[in-house]
Amino acid sequence: MSLLIEQARYHLSAHNARQLPDDGGYEVAFAGRSNAGKSSALNALTRQNALARVSKTPGRTQQLVFFQIQPERYLVDLPGYGYAKVPQDLQAHWQAFIDRYFRTREALRGLVVVMDIRHPLKDYDLQMLGYAAERGLPAHGLLTKADKLGRGQQMQTLQKVKKEVTSRFGDSVTVQTYSGQSRQGVDELRGIVGGWLGLIAEPLAEH
């Protein structure tokens, strides 16, 4: 499975619904607040240093970027959200586009919500998880930058987030800690994503 994930290549960028690929197969979307580490996580997942651009300008990713693993199997990088310098009209456009994507995209099989472990479950994160819950899709909370906390703090935050998402969304959301620096949690993330993409028999899940 990991070798297949590593075959991911840039396919296209969509600024509106007309530019999306045909709605078939399997897609896993990655969402996260600006600078939560979403691009870095995609790069670690695929073992590629520059698959997803790591922008130094928060909020710069303003398109849906599709990375193709196999025909009809994609990783989808959603626009970073929650950055005040993005103009209001552009924020409204992306809100409507993403809303339509989540509500109508049949190929979407799961959502990874990337959150800085020091600031998890902000309003936008909960909104993304809510989209998945409304569609009956599984979601996975990726608590990034875990190396910024001690092991005890990591586990405390992990348990707190698990409790919160379970109370809100039931058992459709799994959660893990992750560090791009130490590569902590990369294999667990691959198990989840590979399962949703149909690349392995069952996704690894930690509730």
From Swiss-Prot:
Region forming the signal peptide: none
Alphabetical GO biological process terms: division septum assembly
Domain EngB-type G: 24-199
Residues engaged in binding Mg(2+): 39, 61
Keyword field contains Cell wall biogenesis/degradation: no
InterPro entries: G_ENGB_dom, GTP-bd, GTP-bd_ribosome_bio_YsxC, P-loop_NTPase
Protein name, as recorded: Probable GTP-binding protein EngB
Organism: Xanthomonas oryzae pv. oryzae (strain KACC10331 / KXO85)
